[in-house]
Amino acid sequence: MEQTFFMIKPDGVKRGFIGEVISRIERRGFSIDRLEVRYADADILKRHYAELTDRPFFPTLVDYMTSGPVIIGVISGEEVISTWRTMMGSTNPKDALPGTIRGDFAQAPSPNQATCNIVHGSDSPESATREIAIWFNN
């Protein structure tokens, strides 16, 4: 049984999509193994987004991710990583297809910024292990 880390980002929480996201996870047949409300800080975000810390948009990303609470969790099921990523939709809300979480709900704040995209999910088993450790063993 595969596990992955997921997050409902501040825009998803503020706009009231917690129940919708959780319902989609449950309807797909995945188990929710852990679920917590957190406030992210710059330190945990630097570890979570380690590959992005040198990018010019990183301070904006930190501002966005610390703008309100996030819901973090661990879900499990067969092929949960790839299936959850498909359910989320494209990272850029403008490219996300209808029927995906981002396609149905996300809003890009400007043409050059795609950070307000409702949810996050690990992209590989290695990322899932790393992200679960960062957020739950912190």
Swiss-Prot record:
Cofactor: Mg(2+)
Keyword Metal-binding part of the UniProt annotation: yes
Domain of life: Bacteria
Cross-referenced SUPFAM superfamilies: Nucleoside diphosphate kinase, NDK
Signal peptide feature range: none
Gene Ontology biological process terms, A to Z: CTP biosynthetic process; GTP biosynthetic process; UTP biosynthetic process
Active-site positions on this chain: 120 (pros-phosphohistidine intermediate)
Cellular compartments annotated: Cytoplasm
Gene3D superfamilies: Nucleoside diphosphate kinase-like domain
UniProt KW Calcium keyword: no
GO molecular function, one term: metal ion binding
Alphabetical list of Pfam families matching this protein: NDK
Record keywords, A-Z: ATP-binding, Cytoplasm, Kinase, Magnesium, Metal-binding, Nucleotide metabolism, Nucleotide-binding, Phosphoprotein, Transferase
Main subcellular localisation: cytoplasm
Enzyme class: transferase
Substrates-to-products reaction catalysed: a 2'-deoxyribonucleoside 5'-diphosphate + ATP = a 2'-deoxyribonucleoside 5'-triphosphate + ADP; a ribonucleoside 5'-diphosphate + ATP = a ribonucleoside 5'-triphosphate + ADP
Binding positions for ATP per the UniProt entry: 9, 57, 85, 91, 102, 112
InterPro entries for this protein: NDK-like_dom, NDK-like_dom_sf, Nucleoside_diP_kinase, Nucleoside_diP_kinase_AS
EC number of this enzyme: 2.7.4.6
GO cellular component, one term: cytoplasm
Record-linked PANTHER family: NUCLEOSIDE DIPHOSPHATE KINASE (PTHR11349)
Annotated family: Belongs to the NDK family.
Role according to the record: Major role in the synthesis of nucleoside triphosphates other than ATP. The ATP gamma phosphate is transferred to the NDP beta phosphate via a ping-pong mechanism, using a phosphorylated active-site intermediate.
Subunit structure: Homotetramer.
UniProt protein name: Nucleoside diphosphate kinase
Provenance organism: Streptococcus agalactiae serotype V (strain ATCC BAA-611 / 2603 V/R)
Lineage: Bacteria, Bacillati, Bacillota, Bacilli, Lactobacillales
